[in-house]
Amino acid sequence: MATTPLKTPKRQTAKSSASKSLASKTHTPKPQASPLARYSAYRQVGDFIFLSGIIAVNPKEGLIIQGFADIPQEAARLIGQTGEFSSDMKIGPILAQSWFVLEQIQKTVEDAGAQMSDVVKLVQYFKNLDHFPLYSRVRNLFFTGVMPTSTV
């Protein structure tokens, strides 16, 4: 008795199914927020936007954000610049870096045609976890209402 071999359906890879059903766009933003190396600042696949990591470096100026002096004066006052040297030197770097990174995220998200309320997840890296409350204070200025999920 001869048996007929089973026909297995052709396996579809994630790449092949995504490319058939979802439009994919790669973006490098305007100079004020362009990446430091050759990579996409974000990638849009269907309704999803995936951002590359953003650090506290201003590529346009070639400047590492180190304190209140490296961000607009209005932003520095808004996030907690006191004018008191010892206090500003202690908390200024993390507040200014947090503001700069979140502003770059906002610019990138808006460049992609979305808004901060569309952000569903953030991943933050800290050298010193004691800085998280200061970062969180700045983050609350950029996100209102439902907060994105977060990994620290």
For each feature predicted by the language model, list its residue ranges.
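Short, polar/acidic, helix-capping and beta-turn segments at strand->helix junctions
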Residues: 2-11, 15, 20-152
